[in-house]
Amino acid sequence: MRRSVAVIGSVAAFLLLCSAQPFQPVPKLYRAKPEDVLPWAEQGNFRFIRLDGGQIESWKAERTWWGEKFSSNEKEVLSHIYDREFEQMLGLLKQADFNWIWVTWSNGWSFKDEEENRENLKKVIARCHENGIHVSAYLSASNMFRKSAFRDDPETKKYGLWMHHIPLFYAGPTKTDLQISWDRRLADTRKPGWRAYLLKKAELAVDAGVDAIAWDNMIGYNDGLAQLLDDTQRMAERKARETGRPKVMVYANVHIPPDRFAMNDINEVIWEEDGKDTPGVWDGHWLVDNARKIKFLSGEKQLWQPLMYENDLYHCGPRELCIPSPAEQKLSIAEAYAFGAATSRNIEGRFLHGLIKGEPEAQEAWNAIAQYNRFLAENKNLYHQTEPAARIALLSAEPHNPLADEFLRQSIFFETKVLAHLDKGAPLDRFKVLVMPADLPKFSAEQKARLNAFAAGGGVIINAGKAGPGIAARAEDAAGGPRLSLEPRGYVLGQLTRKPDGRTFILHLLNYNHQAPAENVKVRLELSGLVDPGEAKDLSRWDVKVLSPDAAQPKFAGLSVHENVCEFTLSRIEHYTVVTLSARPAP
């Protein structure tokens, strides 16, 4: 028996890393289209939060490692968040200016056991729509609670996932801390009967009025999972034709590794939960992992696909068991939006219970979220239809890239080009400089051709080698701008974006030190290479404004605008400050 468990564990661990199976999309699979992203779902137009819940979610938590420590009171709130607690929750969502949530539609129980939850959610969806909140339906792609499913839907017995003649069960969270959930049998999406079974559940969600379908537990064989997404999109198109409603969007938890990410070409939306710590300064270490990963994800996806990014671990612990501080909540939101994503957040467990019961720790965190969401809603133009202004690209093969961390901490304006997806993200010819780290794998013929074309078009390629120091300055010199100088730098970094017409630039400044504001920061922003000298010979005809969710009227002094340089001093950056430079209309 012990040997069998060990074998099952090793196979389950393999499936946890199913991104090790490279995915190559085949021509017959559905391709998502930008016109199917409705205006409210475009990047910068939404504030998203997960609202996992219902009796079926409480049952699931009891049978999985992340929910085993929930108290009876936490499980009670979770069970009733879609019925007796929902009106209070709706008020909280409105208070915090959320306009997009997801709900637990189906997570692996039988049709019969999920029926009450579906009926509750029909009312939830209607109430959300009445209040301007859009709703995604969460479904599990591979999970079966076998006692329930096998009893009520006996055909599911035929759909189990096997490997080396061993039945596979849900396991996690990591290979080194592997806990097998024996109640959660995994299904094989390659089997048409299983996909048809899931599509019946997804179609019921569309009939209930949801705006999107979100697939989780994308575990197993890539060809079957991709076919499930394809089937979902075909169903969504059919329902749109039949009802006249907009087509529901589709997205899935594919994860960040580039070998499998191309599956997202089938989806309109990108949702990822690859954050492993909260942004900040921890024991003297300046953590910019999330900003780096968001840049990597932006290099993997289509430019038009909205991106939602979530931490499955916070600095205080697992997301279900702790509540990050107000300062951490604020910086997480600001970081995501500054770098072109939206924050996703799982409040299931400790946080949800604290909100419903009015606990001060939860209320303070929620108030911080509401404060920043209001700023985002009132200043959508800072995040909607914007693009990075960088002229430096950094080539990365994997999400982890120490050079990216160095560039971020030095406020080098750059974007990530992902080696396996050079056709995605910002086009390579938009950049002047491409920095290549030393540890890249061997290039394919297609990759070589793209890089050669970049160089032939006047692009500068810098091989970083092992000599990291000095690379940033070389890249900035070769790019010729833009460039940012902060004095004192402290733990502040900057990101520069712009409107597509080039007449508005947006400088995002984030202070990663939760304990102390950055004070009297001298800012020098050079926009060489970006301001069109034929239209505005210098910045003297540009308006400069400073905004912050932390202060009604942020103070700045010593404004000097000349040629392509803007200089000023910010008296205080508590967590997040935005500076806009806008060209005045010609007289």
Where are these regions (language model features)?
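Bacterial Sec-dependent signal peptides at the C-terminal "C-region" and cleavage site
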Residues: 12-25
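Carbohydrate-binding surfaces of carbohydrate-active enzymes
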Residues: 26, 199, 226-247, 255-257, ...
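Hydrophobic faces of well-ordered beta-strands that scaffold small-molecule active sites
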Residues: 47-54, 101-103, 135-137, 213-215, ...
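The substrate-binding groove and active-site-proximal loops of carbohydrate-active enzymes
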Residues: 47-82, 103-118, 179-196, 218-226, ...
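Active-site-adjacent "subsite" loops/lids of carbohydrate-active enzymes
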Residues: 64-83, 121, 137-208
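Acidic (Asp/Glu)-rich catalytic clusters
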Residues: 89-97, 123-131, 261-264, 291-301
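Aromatic-lined substrate-binding rim segments of carbohydrate-active enzymes
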Residues: 89-90, 103-143, 224-235
